[in-house]
Swiss-Prot record:
Domain ASCH: 6-101
Function of the molecule: Catalyzes the hydrolysis of N(4)-acetylcytidine (ac4C).
Matching CDD domains: ASCH_yqfb_like
Enzyme class: hydrolase
Gene3D superfamilies: Hypothetical protein
Keywords linked to the UniProt accession: Hydrolase
Protein name: N(4)-acetylcytidine amidohydrolase
Length: 103
């Protein structure tokens, strides 16, 4: 079995598969992904594969510069997005936006 290249919390799986979630915001440890990369995607909880994505763009962002567009691409409100990011990455301010599409 091939290893997964990136994982998402299971709660995001349906939104990814339906095309409602089209970005992910990560910390520096996952800043190496580049436009054009094709990635196997698994669930964080069990590493079970559930789709393949292609990276369509990358950029940097801070918690303070997150926008309504980022929130829309994450399929949540801006307030929810800021809370999720702060919960996952406490005490961090610099993040990496990975835009993607399911293949």
């Amino acid at each position: 079995m091939q290893p997964n290249d990136i994982t998402f919390f299971q709660r995001f799986q349906d939104d990814i598969l339906a095309g409602r979630k089209t970005i992910t915001i990560r910390d520096e440890s996952e800043s190496h992904f580049k436009t054009g990369d094709v990635l196997r995607v698994g669930r964080f909880e069990d590493d079970g594969y559930f789709c393949t994505i292609e990276v369509t763009a990358t950029s940097t962002v801070t918690l303070d510069t997150l926008t309504e567009k980022h929130a829309e691409q994450e399929n949540m409100t801006l307030t929810e997005l800021k809370k999720v990011i702060a919960d996952i990455y406490p005490d961090q301010t610099q993040f990496y936006v990975i835009e993607f599409k399911c293949l």
